Structure formats: structure tokens, C-alpha cells
Regions:
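Conserved RNase H-like, two-metal-ion catalytic cores of nucleic-acid enzymes
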Residues: 5-6, 10, 16-55, 71-72, ...
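Charged catalytic and DNA/RNA-contacting regions of genome-maintenance
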Residues: 129-131, 137-174, 317-318, 335, ...
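Conserved catalytic core of nucleic-acid polymerases
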Residues: 439-442, 496, 602, 609, ...
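Conserved "right-hand" nucleotidyltransferase catalytic core of DNA-directed polymerases
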Residues: 232-353, 436-632, 653, 663, ...
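C-terminal polymerase-core module
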Residues: 518-522, 526-578, 746-794, 798, ...
Length: 881
């Protein structure tokens, strides 16, 4: 067997990972971004290069011989941040769990250890791969050793072997040492020869081979280069010595100690779970063949022949695990290829399309609990057949979302199976591939498809009791069974129903936008004095800051920043700014909503069938995609015009019901602030009331400006805004914003107490809860980084309020949906956006629909203040506002 060693520069990779990735923390508040980046890279390297041996070298704090010879060596380096320092020991512990060899030796750097170990391995017939972010290691490249230099943080590597170094740099790997001796290295504070850069250095090395060769032939060098070299000969020789990686460090190990693979998978999984690396869990199965990883489900798969017997068995158990596989097609008439069914998760049956109606009883029976993975898809798959999947009881994706709402990558069955069962289930990408070459489920051969589905069904049955126990312990079992699971059916029907779009009006709007864009382009070119690509930040930056001479607010790596924040600060500097802002807004409206909507109108019914997502946001809010209806801009009139294209069908009207200030009402209830509760109970305008409290005037004396400012304060408090954030919103001094907030908390003192208690609870528990016990974990609240800690505090203040508002709208949706069904109405709930529900009501049913919607929304939960609903009717979404 060929022996392959991967040796990693631990300090280099963890440093690069730390600065490449945003801050991450586990539930205990431990920083994990550097560990995550390192581990992700490690798994990728193992998967790519399949090493038989691995070692990781680390620096030690003790000074090296380089520090002794040159006191200024690495003197300019910044002190290591505490957030990075605290990740070293957990990383080393993880490496130990992988049974990966580690080396660190006093007096020597990781580079020297790598140089020595790689030489020993080469001499023993190994193929060697060195992984580092430091180009110094290129000097170690040879016919037996490839140096992998990380790029794009630690996401990719560039390979350097002996031939590729010569091809790219026209010098041998060892001549890299001479080059560094000449040009120095700022990061290590190696001086080199002042005035000699890379270009001149390469030219000299190519001509004279080495620093020694240069000085042996110094008289053949002319001009200032000769002078620089003569004046700095000792510096050049010393710099070369400092840059030379030592390859005879007194290491004590034998190569057998570096063998990779003899590890306990459960130990690694336990550490991954502790660190919160749920997205990495499935990748352990790719590496491991030990008994710890279950690679095959112990199941039987067969075609269902005796349907009556199976129906009786399902009725006896009152549970059915279901997974449908559909052919590609339109949501309204998509055909089912197979349905896989099981009672116990071990004996799995499949049927084809011709048997669907024979099983209708078990699908539609409310007595039989339906269990599965992404049950919304299964519900929608049966809709074209006129079959309604009743009693959607347990979906492992939704259960896992409640258990860990912070991990947006962990809800795939592969991650769930590995996390709870140490079982390998292929990811969607592993099964189907990725990109343009990705297959569809319908294209898989039956053996591969059925094997994968059986793994999913086995996982559903096996993890359900574990998840149920977790949810019970955290008091979220009620949230699952009474809110999230009943909501699946509601969202599925909303997707299937869709919303009617006026295509003619949409095209008309597109024409208007194009005319405005053309006009704005002309005006921008006139002010700037030339034509240029307005959509290019680089070209726009040159126009604004060089040609027009506007003050530079911020720079990026590629030039001037022209983002929205920068443009906002330049508004008073030139008339071109307002036109650029408007241009960008209209271009986005046209591309996202006009062109975007036109491309997804269903040809069968002329409606748009948005996907409603239940497991995306950390707060519990529902989101939507294709299109994202939550983001349709309403502050601009042109943005509001987009709502004109969403219309009611013939013989119908849109009934729009919007909660009035639901988050402030939740705040009043949760804080038990008497002043705010009293204001809502007496139907006082809460923003006017707040203005009178903050500005110490009677409610009759409140001006429109004061009310507007008070509104910003009210919602600023809900979102945990700082005095600085409020000052930016209101365009007032920070001191004044601070006074507003202080006055607010003086008048609403229970709210201040409530917010303080929430922060304290979040700091001690690591999470906050909503009125229905939904948890939002906030690890950043324990960060030693001031800005992140403050962001955590803001999230802690907002999450219970916004999350409770999400709980309320979900309950309202379920109740409205049920009432429409119970009354046998043809009217349908079709949209949910923020705190707003839209029902497409048949003309003859409008009165009863209005009553149902208002009653169910206002009585969704019992609070100490009323839930008020604003209700409007119109032919389009725009008309209801």
C-alpha cells in the first residue's frame, strides 16, 4: 500500500480560519469559528488526498533560535486575540479524538517541525503533502513533497510540487529561500535588502542562482542594485538564514505514531455536538468504516401486494411513515412515481401510481398519525389526486428546527441521522450530484432510490422518540404538536393554491420601470459629464470620488465603497446621489419583481406558487421563496405598486387582515408594564402615548414629528436598538437619542426591568423563550468581543417579542384555515406576510370570511391586552392598503 503523509501547520491554518470566518459560538459561548474552519479544511484534505498518516505541528510560546539571533524577528506581529487563543485547546482536543498525531517543540517553529518530519517521511518512501497558509513552505516542495498553500481563507488550496514551482516562478523550491533573503518578509519582520523587491530578486536569483552566487559576482552587477547589496550583505545573509526551514530538528517519534484512522467515532461526534458542528457530522461517515458508523439500514423493501392486510396493520398501529417520490412537473399536476410506506420503519413497502387510490383510506384517515421527513412535500404530492394527507403528526425536520433553530444546515436527514444515531445517510448532493449535472430523484435506478428512502424511513422511526424526549425536556412538545405540525398542512395548501397575478399589469409596470431607468441614466450621465456603467461600483466610485470630488467615506480592497450606507451619507453633497439611489431601487424592483415574477407565473392557472419555509429563521417567523413576498418594498410608491399585480380571481375579493402593533402588545404583556397595558386597554394611540411620555407633553400637544420619533423609539426598544442606532434612524445626536431612551424607560419602567431580566437570563441560560416556550439560543451574549456581546443583548431583547409574534400569527393561520374548512367555504387562505394574512374570498362569502378572520386572529392567544386587527377588502393587494 502506498504511504501518504499529510502534515499540517496548525498555527497557520487556525489563524487563517479565524480571520476568514465570521464569529461562531456553541451554546456555552465558546468561540468556534477557527476550529470549524480548521476541521472543515481537515476533512476536505482527508477526502481529497486519502492520507495513511497525518500530523499537525504547532508553535510554542518559547522563543526560537531565530529570536535569539535576531531580536526583532516577528516583532511587528499583533497580539493574538483572546477569541482565537481560547480555540487552540479545544482544537487540540478534537485532533486527539481523531487520533491525529501532534508535534510542538521548544525552540523551533511549526515550519521547522514540518520540514524535519517531511524529510524523514520522504526518506522512508512516503508521498508527502504539507498544508499551510505560509508560502515559506514552498521551499520544501520536491518530487516527493507537494506543498498545499491555502487560499480564500482556508476554503481552497494551491498545489506546489518541484515542477510547478519552476514553471510558475522560474526557480527551484530551495531558491525561494534566497528570494526571501533578498526581499525580506514583513509578516515575520525579516529585513531582507532594503529596496530589493520580488521582481528584482527573481531576476538576480535567475542570473546568479543564490545569495552566495550574487555576492561572488557582485562586480558584474551595476548601479543602485549593486550599492544596495553591498551595503546590506550581512542583512541578506542573515535574512536567508532566518528564512531557511530547519530539517534536522531533534524530534522524537516513529512514523507508526502518525498512522491515521484508529479513532472512536462516537468521541468525535460527541465533540462535534458540543461545538455545534452539526453540518460536519454527516462527513464523518464518509471517512469511517468502523462499527460506530451504521452504513446500511436493517430493513426489508418489497412491493406492496396485499393492500388490505397492510391497511389493517396501519389501523392497528395508528401510525404511518410515508415518503413520496414524484416525477418532475408542474405543482398542479405533478405525478407520483413511488410512495414508500412503513409502520415500524423496518419493513418498507412501495407502491406505484396505479395503487394510490387503493390506499386513500390510510392517507385521509384522521385516526392515523403521519410521520416523515419534509411531510409538506408529501402532502403537496397527493394534492393533484384529490387526496388530502390528514393528521400530519411528526416531521423530523421541524422537530430538529425547534431543538436547534440556530443551525440552518442541520435539518437534512443525513445530519439528523448522524447526530442522533451515528448513522450514515447520503446527503442530497452525494446522492444526486451538484450543479448542472445533478440528477433528479426520478432518474435514480430503483435500487439506489429505494435504499436511500429506506434509510430516511428508518431514521424517522428511530429518532422520533429521542426528539420527543428532547422537546419534552425543553417544554417545546406543545409547540410542535399544537402549532408547528398543524401548520404544515396550512402552508402546503397555501403553496398549492397560489396567488393570482395580473400579467398584463406586470408587463405595463416593467415598461414604466424601464422608462424611469432610462431617464435616470440620462440625468446621471449629464451630471457626471460622461457615460459609464452605473452598476459597476468601481466605475461609479471613480466618477463620484475622483471626477466629482465627493468626500471618500469608505474604501474597499478594489476601490471606493458605494454601498447604500455611503450614498446615504453623501445625499447633501451632490444631486447625483439621489438619482443613483433611485436608479438602484428601480433596477432592483424591475429585475427582482417584474422579470422575476414573470418567470415563475404558472402556465396552468396564471398564479404564483411561492414556497413557504418553516425552518429558516431563528425567530420562528415564516419565510417565503420564489418569490420572497416578505421583501416586497412598501416604503416607496413604486415598490407599493408591485402589490397591484397580486389580484383576486374572478368572482372573488382579497380580504387582508393585519395585526395592529402586535409586537408592542406582546411587549406590554410580557413586561407587565401598567402604563403600556393601560394605553392599549383604553385604545389610545400607543405612539402618541409614548410621545407624551418621552417628551413630557399632553397627548393633545403631541406633534406629528414627535409621534414619528416616538414610533421609532417604540420599535427601536423592541429591536434592542442602542442610542447610536436610534440616532442614525432619527438623524439626531447620540446624546439626544440616549435621552429619548432614558425617558422611555423612566416612564415604562417595567419594560426596562423586563429587558434587564431577559439579558440576565440569556447570559445564564444561553437562550431566551417566547410565550409558547420557543427557544432562541444566543451564544454571542457571552462573547468577549464588545460588539458581538452587544449584538447578543439586542437579539436577547428582541427574540422573545418577535418570536412570540411569530407564534401568534401561526396559531391565527391554523385557526382561520380550520374555520374556513369547517364552514365548507370555497374561500382560501393564500398569503402570510409578516403580521398579515390574506384570504381570497368568494364574493358571496365575504361577510363570513371577515368575521372568521377577525375573530380567529384577535383570539389566537390570551394576552393582558387586546389583539387588534385592521381588516380591508380589495381587488388587489394594493387596494387593501
Amino acid at each position: 500500500m502506498n504511504k501518504t503523509l499529510v502534515i499540517i501547520d496548525g498555527n497557520s491554518i487556525i489563524n487563517r480560519a479565524f480571520y476568514a470566518l465570521p464569529e461562531m459560538s456553541n451554546k456555552e459561548g465558546l468561540k468556534t469559528n477557527a476550529i470549524y474552519g480548521f476541521t472543515n479544511m481537515l476533512l476536505k484534505i482527508i477526502d481529497t488526498y486519502n492520507p495513511t498518516h497525518i500530523s499537525v505541528a504547532f508553535d510554542r510560546k518559547a522563543p526560537t533560535f531565530r529570536h535569539i539571533e535576531f531580536k526583532e524577528y516577528k516583532a511587528g506581529r499583533k497580539k493574538m486575540p483572546d477569541e482565537l487563543r481560547e480555540q487552540f485547546e479545544p482544537l487540540k482536543d478534537l485532533l486527539d479524538k481523531f487520533n491525529i498525531h501532534r508535534l510542538e517543540i521548544d525552540g523551533y517553529e511549526a515550519d521547522d517541525i514540518i520540514g524535519t518530519v517531511s524529510k524523514i517521511a520522504e526518506d522512508n518512501g512516503f508521498k508527502v503533502y504539507i498544508v499551510t497558509g505560509d508560502k515559506d513552505a514552498i521551499q520544501l516542495a520536491s518530487n516527493k513533497t507537494t506543498t498545499l498553500i491555502t487560499k480564500k481563507g482556508v476554503g481552497e488550496v494551491e498545489e506546489y510540487d518541484y515542477d510547478s514551482v519552476i514553471e510558475k516562478y522560474e526557480m527551484t523550491p530551495t531558491q525561494f529561500i534566497d528570494l526571501k533573503g533578498l526581499m525580506g518578509d514583513k509578516s515575520d519582520n525579516i529585513p531582507g535588502v532594503p529596496g530589493i523587491g520580488e521582481k528584482t530578486g527573481i531576476k538576480l536569483i535567475k542570473e546568479f542562482s543564490s545569495i552566495e552566487g550574487i555576492f561572488d559576482n557582485i562586480d558584474s552587477i551595476k548601479g543602485s542594485t549593486k550599492k544596495k547589496l553591498e551595503e546590506n550583505k550581512e542583512l541578506a545573509i542573515m535574512s536567508k538564514k532566518l528564512a531557511t526551514i530547519i530539517r534536522d530538528v531533534p524530534v522524537e517519534f516513529n512514523l507508526e505514531e502518525l498512522e491515521y484512522g484508529n479513532y472512536n467515532t462516537k468521541d468525535i461526534l460527541d465533540v462535534f455536538k458540543y461545538l455545534g458542528f452539526t453540518s460536519l457530522i454527516p462527513r464523518i461517515g464518509n471517512l469511517d468504516e468502523s462499527e460506530e458508523i451504521v452504513n446500511e439500514a436493517n430493513v426489508e423493501i418489497s412491493k406492496l401486494e396485499d393492500i388490505d392486510e397492510f391497511i389493517n396493520k396501519v389501523k392497528e398501529n395508528n401510525e404511518l411513515i410515508i415518503k413520496t417520490v414524484t416525477r418532475e412537473g408542474n405543482i398542479l399536476d405533478k405525478r407520483i412515481k413511488y410512495i414508500f410506506l412503513s409502520v415500524d420503519g423496518k419493513k418498507i413497502y412501495y407502491v406505484e401510481e396505479d395503487s394510490i387510490y387503493k390506499l386513500e383510506y390510510i392517507f385521509t384517515s384522521n385516526e392515523i398519525k403521519k410521520l416523515g421527513y419534509n411531510l409538506k412535500d408529501d402532502y403537496i404530492s397527493l394534492k393533484p389526486y384529490g387526496i388530502k394527507l390528514e393528521n400530519i403528526y411528526f416531521d423530523i425536520t421541524i422537530a430538529e428546527y425547534l431543538i436547534d433553530s440556530m443551525s440552518s444546515t442541520s435539518y437534512e436527514c443525513s445530519a439528523i441521522a448522524m447526530k442522533y444515531l451515528t448513522k450514515k445517510v447520503k446527503t442530497k448532493e452525494e446522492l444526486l450530484g451538484k450543479g448542472v449535472k445533478a440528477k433528479k430523484y426520478q432518474d435514480l435506478d430503483f435500487e439506489e432510490l429505494s435504499s436511500h428512502i429506506s434509510q430516511i424511513i428508518d431514521t424517522v422511526k428511530s429518532v422520533m422518540p429521542i426528539m420527543e424526549e428532547n422537546l419534552k425536556e425543553s417544554n417545546m412538545d406543545g409547540l410542535l404538536y399544537h402549532v408547528e405540525m398543524p401548520l404544515v398542512e396550512v402552508l402546503a395548501d397555501m403553496e398549492y393554491e397560489g396567488v393570482k397575478v395580473d400579467k398584463e399589469k406586470l408587463n405595463e409596470l416593467g415598461s414604466q420601470f424601464k422608462e424611469i431607468i432610462k431617464k435616470l441614466e440620462s440625468e446621471i450621465y449629464k451630471i457626471s459629464g460622461e457615460e459609464f456603467n452605473i452598476n459597476s461600483p468601481k466605475q461609479l466610485g471613480v466618477i463620484l470620488f475622483e471626477k466629482l470630488g465627493l468626500p471618500v467615506i469608505k474604501k474597499t480592497k478594489t476601490g471606493y465603497s458605494t454601498n447604500a450606507e455611503v450614498l446615504d451619507k453623501l445625499k447633501d453633497q451632490s444631486p447625483i446621489i439621489d438619482k443613483i439611489i433611485e436608479y438602484r431601487q428601480i433596477v432592483k424592483l424591475n429585475s427582482t419583481y417584474v422579470e422575476g415574477l414573470l418567470s415563475i407565473i404558472n402556465p396552468i392557472d396564471g398564479r404564483i406558487h411561492s414556497s413557504f419555509n418553516q425552518t429558516i429563521t431563528t425567530t420562528g417567523r415564516i419565510s417565503s421563496t420564489e418569490p420572497n413576498l416578505q421583501n416586497i418594498p412598501v416604503k416607496l410608491e413604486m415598490g407599493r405598486n408591485i402589490r397591484k399585480v397580486f389580484i383576486s380571481d374572478k368572482g372573488c375579493k382579497l380580504v387582508d387582515a393585519d395585526y395592529s402593533q402586535v409586537e408592542l402588545r406582546v411587549l406590554a404583556h410580557m413586561s407587565q408594564d401598567e402604563t403600556m397595558i393601560d394605553a392599549f386597554k383604553h385604545n389610545e394611540d400607543i405612539h402618541t402615548k409614548t410621545a407624551s411620555q418621552v417628551f413630557n407633553v399632553s397627548m393633545d400637544e403631541v406633534t406629528s414629528k414627535q409621534r414619528s420619533d416616538a414610533k421609532a423609539v417604540n420599535f427601536g426598544i423592541v429591536y434592542g436598538k442602542s442610542d447610536f442606532g436610534l440616532s442614525e434612524d432619527l438623524n439626531i445626536p447620540v446624546k439626544q437619542a440616549k435621552e429619548y431612551i432614558e425617558n422611555y424607560f423612566n416612564k415604562y419602567n417595567k419594560i426596562k426591568e423586563f429587558m434587564d431580566n431577559i439579558i440576565e437570563d440569556a447570559s445564564s441560560n444561553g437562550y431566551v423563550t417566547t410565550i409558547l416556550n420557543r427557544r432562541r439560543y444566543i451564544p454571542e451574549i457571552k462573547s468577549s468581543n464588545f460588539m458581538l456581546r452587544n449584538a447578543g443583548k439586542r437579539a436577547a431583547m428582541n427574540a422573545p417579542i418577535q418570536g412570540s409574534a411569530a407564534d401568534i400569527i401561526k396559531i391565527a393561520m391554523i385557526n382561520v384555515y380550520k374555520k374556513l374548512e369547517e364552514n365548507n367555504l370555497k374561500s382560501k387562505l393564500i398569503l402570510q406576510v409578516h403580521d398579515e394574512l390574506i384570504v381570497e374570498a368568494v364574493d358571496s362569502e365575504i361577510d363570513i370570511v371577515k368575521k372568521i378572520v377577525k375573530d380567529e386572529m384577535e383570539n389566537a392567544v390570551c394576552l393582558d391586552v387586546n389583539l387588534d386587527v385592521d381588516l380591508n377588502i380589495g381587488d388587489s393587494w394594493y387596494d387593501t392598503k
